[in-house]
Amino acid sequence: MSTQLSRFFQNRSWLDAIVTVYGADIDLGNRKAWQKVSRQNAAFARIHDKTYISVTSNFKRILNYSNLRKKFAKKGLWCWWSYLQHGLGFLGLVAPISVAQGFDKVLFASTDEYVYGLPWGSHPTVDGLTQWSNTEVMTECDNWTRLEKIRYIVRLRQPVSLRSCWRDETGGNCCVCRACIVDVASLLTEDANPSAYGYLFDGITPESTLAIFKPGTVMFKSHADEPDYHQWLAVQEILRGKLGKGADFGKFQRFAVKIAQLRLEDYFVDLPPRWQT
């Protein structure tokens, strides 16, 4: 979500509409979560005087990802959705909408995989060259890391609810998975209150979420995790610097200390030599 928001704020003067897809990160069977996310996105669009468009699609359900993985994993395609489908899949859903609405530009959210030169299902050399009718696809922030995008959003001083979690079935953030934890830590590097950005920690303490880092637990498995790994390294460096200067993160103090102290190399299957620090 940080990607979409950073791009929105940079280009909002000419954007006419915001499109959200039901059936991508939220399964078609989870209507309750979709309604929550859709309401939030519609409210965001309304505040910024933009049209809100929602699309419902079974473009993930029609594929057997297990069979695709069995067939193509040996060729490096461990996840069909991530490595191949999602870029052109999203653009394919937006294409008929853009023609019907008369839009001549589509702004497509980037991912930080570009920065590390990894094979990925969304890339400027593919997305940015995709055209139909009189519509062109624009890609920006392609060289920004996820941490840089979060930093940009925080410095706008307009707190919004981010959604980085794929595990929470209510449409929010579980605050206990790797994706949530690293984004909470990223917000702390900018002295931002994670609760103001949608990380609510209902009924749990921030430091208790780090229980997922147990001896022998594998957190980083393949080169597809490289962007996450580098985000963790950058976050740790900043937090260590702040803590060394006596920073006080309030109820997140223990959380920040534990994040800064983690030995990330302990959570790899095999730490690639070029990742070693």
Describe every region a protein language model picked out:
Residues 2-277:
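Nucleotide-activated chemistry modules centered on ATP-dependent adenylation/adenylyltransferase
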